[in-house]
Amino acid sequence: MEAPQNVGIKRRLKRFFRRDGRALIFAMDHGFEHGPTDFEPVWEHVNPRVIIRKVVRAGIDGVMMLPGLARIAGDEVKPEVGLMIKLTSKTNLRPKPEQLLQSQLGFVDDAIKLGADAIAATVYWGSPQEDVMMRQFAEIVSYAHDLGYPVVQFAYPRGPYIDEKYGKKEDYRVVMYGARAAAESGADMIKTYWTGSKETFAKVVEAAAGVPVLLSGGAKTENPVDFLKVVWEVIEAGGAGAVVGRNIFQRENPEPMIKALIRVIHRNEDPEEAAKAEGLI
């Protein structure tokens, strides 16, 4: 008989993944990590209730936020939508050397009390502070798994050594390494960078050894079709979907983009056709 905690992990992962094994998750940690200026393109979205209400109505599979925001607006995440609470973060107000460290904001028990279906944490693989984040992640995984909760790793390789050796953090060899490290450190889901091509992202997926890999949405793409094409390539490469923030909340009306992403991720639709169907072009 399977251990009860493993059953719990599998059941809770299904709160995010549809039967096709894919997910579209809305990221809402930008106000802390980047600052409220991220919301200036559409200022009403600085109010978490406003934007969460919109994305839930549009059919999002899951929402990711920090513990404090979950206390403020977590009740806007309807029961049919997965809630992911991220326990580590940083601000852009830190001195540059400390930008490569994520600090812990809360504990697994806090996230569970707030109704989390999954726990998330970031590791900057290759950072001079990598050891601190590895230890944080190990403690979160150990405790959460004992209670039957899945853990998501935002596997973000970055640091001076990576810049020096590989030139950029999105080099597929670096992203692939980060995905493998995430899998081997106990992640049940991985969020990471786009590597620039379907072929290289497929290697990232393979390196993750069966752990679902989701795209980190990144900065807003002015042409929505360009972003939909990237997501389509992620799916073609074997990726399990996307975690998207700015490409949703920096749009006046985020609903068409969400619905177009759902078409690409869950229905395998051509990006241009999906964009046309939702009035994006």
Swiss-Prot record:
<comment type="subunit">
    <text>Homooctamer.</text>
</comment>
<dbReference type="InterPro" id="IPR050456">
    <property type="entry name" value="DeoC/FbaB_aldolase"/>
</dbReference>
<feature type="active site" description="Schiff-base intermediate with dihydroxyacetone-P">
    <location>
        <position position="191"/>
    </location>
</feature>
<dbReference type="InterPro" id="IPR002915">
    <property type="entry name" value="DeoC/FbaB/LacD_aldolase"/>
</dbReference>
<dbReference type="GO" id="GO:0004332">
    <property type="term" value="F:fructose-bisphosphate aldolase activity"/>
</dbReference>
<dbReference type="InterPro" id="IPR053414">
    <property type="entry name" value="FBA_class_1"/>
</dbReference>
<dbReference type="InterPro" id="IPR041720">
    <property type="entry name" value="FbaB-like"/>
</dbReference>
<keyword id="KW-0456">Lyase</keyword>
<keyword id="KW-0324">Glycolysis</keyword>
<dbReference type="Pfam" id="PF01791">
    <property type="entry name" value="DeoC"/>
</dbReference>
<keyword id="KW-0963">Cytoplasm</keyword>
<keyword id="KW-0704">Schiff base</keyword>
<comment type="similarity">
    <text>Belongs to the DeoC/FbaB aldolase family.</text>
</comment>
<dbReference type="GO" id="GO:0006096">
    <property type="term" value="P:glycolytic process"/>
</dbReference>
<dbReference type="InterPro" id="IPR013785">
    <property type="entry name" value="Aldolase_TIM"/>
</dbReference>
<protein>
    <recommendedName>
        <fullName>Fructose-bisphosphate aldolase class 1</fullName>
        <ecNumber>4.1.2.13</ecNumber>
    </recommendedName>
</protein>
<dbReference type="GO" id="GO:0005737">
    <property type="term" value="C:cytoplasm"/>
</dbReference>
